[in-house]
Amino acid sequence: MNAPLASGRPDIQSADGIWHCCHLLPDADPDRAVRDAALVVEQGRIAWLGAEAELPADYRSLPRHDAGGTWMTPGLVDCHTHLVYGGQRADEFAMRLAGASYEEIARAGGGIVSSVRATRAADEDTLFSQAAARLAPLLAEGVTAIEIKSGYGLELEAERRQLRVARRLGEAFGVSVHTTFLGAHALPPEYAGRADDYIDLVCNTMLPALAEEGLVDAVDAFCESVGFSLAQTERVFEAAARHGLRVKLHAEQLSNLGGAALAARHHALSADHLEHLDEAGVEAMAAAGTVAVLLPGAYYFLRDTNLPPIALLRKHGVPIAISTDHNPGTSPVTSLLLMMNMACTLFRLTVPEALAGVTTHAARALGAPDRHGKLAVGRAADFVLWRVESPAELAYWFGRNPAAVVVRQGRIHPATSQHGGRA
């Protein structure tokens, strides 16, 4: 049996068998690339990979999938998104073009609080259908694992709806979803002037309930002058620790409050944004093993001019991840490949750094380096076949999706198997 690439057969679902006639990049290290390679999938997991000429005899009778000379990489990992929310905020785009700052939009009643109103008003099915439409292009581009935050409810029931929708998306689309509780995202209107009281609600009511329901994989906060203070953020981190949950942090996006160092003290999975990060913060992250998650979409959309300290991150050996930061206000982007290009062009990352940023390092930012971001025997079959001459093209093109086939959790993504990457 030979299952050709893009065969047009809608009944192709299982990825079990031999994937051959491909070139293999098992992780982001170009020195580990294998030309004329093969990969064997059994019961949805990788059973063998290497040069096709060395394929063990025991596997040679398995069904075959002709990869057509494509490049195979691990599935991509989008490690920072706000995918579930109500409505959109195109009106704020016009305000920003007219010169309004992030802080000015927030103080005028826009920003996060605007999305809070729309999210609170939406039922679960509405949130699901809207989020599914945003997820589709990411999946078609090869995303096989994604983090989804709450943070647009800012009350227990609305936060619960967001996290339940995130779980539903994973089940419905066969994608690995890692949920993050971001109750400390902004101050809801009913708590105006009472930030400490709201943090009480986050730590003592919302987080315990949502953790008990199994809806939370990690906990995040927005540590900024328009968000929450270091002391308030630390309270959230301490509450997370009581529930055995790892933390991450929106830090040093608009100013340097020392959030990255605080995150490192709590052994955070990641500190994200980091445009105003200083060397002390970099050193703290390096010592703690905290991943730096760069979000070039927000940098571009906000027309920022303060670059993250790439040279310092390299100097101190801090792993660098890249993500879409998909959200309605500052990064309404649904292309992780575009973020790779922007990370290279705007932040001057190398192509191998960009590839690591959406595979191995992004998996580490999720606390799942043993599950995502690398092709290895025993792992779930999450991989992408790309119609490119070299993996460098993944960061080179923008406005084009070269994905030919996406396999998630051992299943062939039907849209890409039939239509060459278009959802």
Curated annotation (Swiss-Prot):
- Give the first-level EC class, as a single word: hydrolase
Origin: domain of life: Bacteria
Chief localisation class = cytoplasm
Pathway it acts in?
Amino-acid degradation; L-histidine degradation into L-glutamate; N-formimidoyl-L-glutamate from L-histidine: step 3/3
Q: Where is Fe(3+) annotated to bind?
A: H80, H82, H250, D325
Recorded hits in InterPro entries, A to Z, give: Amidohydro-rel, HutI, Metal-dep_hydrolase_composite, Metal_Hydrolase
Which of this chain's residues are annotated to bind N-formimidoyl-L-glutamate? Answer: Y152, N327, G329
Query: What CDD domains does the annotation carry?
Result: Imidazolone-5PH (cd01296)
One Pfam family it belongs to: Amidohydro_1
Is Iron one of the keywords UniProt gives this record? yes
The function of this protein is: Catalyzes the hydrolytic cleavage of the carbon-nitrogen bond in imidazolone-5-propanoate to yield N-formimidoyl-L-glutamate. It is the third step in the universal histidine degradation pathway.
| UniProt record similarity statement | Belongs to the metallo-dependent hydrolases superfamily. HutI family.
Q: Any idea what this protein is called?
A: Imidazolonepropionase
Provide the species name: Cupriavidus pinatubonensis (strain JMP 134 / LMG 1197) (Cupriavidus necator (strain JMP 134))
